[in-house]
Each structure stands twice: as structure tokens, then as C-alpha cells.
Amino acid sequence: MGKQLELFETTASFDVLIENVAGWAKDKGIDKKENAPKQLLKVLEEVGETAGALLKSKDEEIKDGIGDSFVTIIILAKQLGLEPAECLEAAWNEIKDRTGKTENGVFIKN
């Protein structure tokens, strides 16, 4: 039962963070659907910065990059009228029973 409680507490704080990010985006005036193409570029920029940090083995920059990537994806989802948690749940439901094999540290689906 402890793991379920931890998951619930983590999920609850993740939900709060999502709403904080959405509120921040609204305050900055970047919450509108017409901004989605520009926001997608921000997502790609942050993922690219994360890749650069990973290649340099810079742990703090990796953590920052992953966090920034989350933020930009949350904003993009909200701009498109999507709930980030629902997007994650849909992806999880798609992959949870997926079969395949792992080669060189990468999972390859059947």
C-alpha cells in the first residue's frame, strides 16, 4: 500500500505543478492555441539542450533540461486544449502491453 500512497502523493504534486505552469503561461500571454507552433519550437529547443547536457554528462544541466522540456510540453498541451496527464495516460495505455526486444539499450517494438 505504501507504494500506492507514494504514487498518489507524487501525482497530486505533479497535478499542482501542471496547474502552476499553466497559470504562469497564462500570465505571460502564451496560453493561446495560435502560439502552439512557436511553442513546439521551444519544446524542440529544450529537448536539444537536454541532449547536449547528456552528451557532456552534466547532471544538473540534464535535470534542468528535462524540467524545461516538461514545462514546454505542458504549455503546448494546454494551448491545444489537452490535459497533460491524459496525454501521458494515453501513451502509457498504448505502450504498457507492448512487446518487442531491447537492442543496445533501446526498446524496439514488434
Give the predicted meaning of each segment.
Residues 1-66, 70-110:
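Flexible "arm" and connector segments at domain edges
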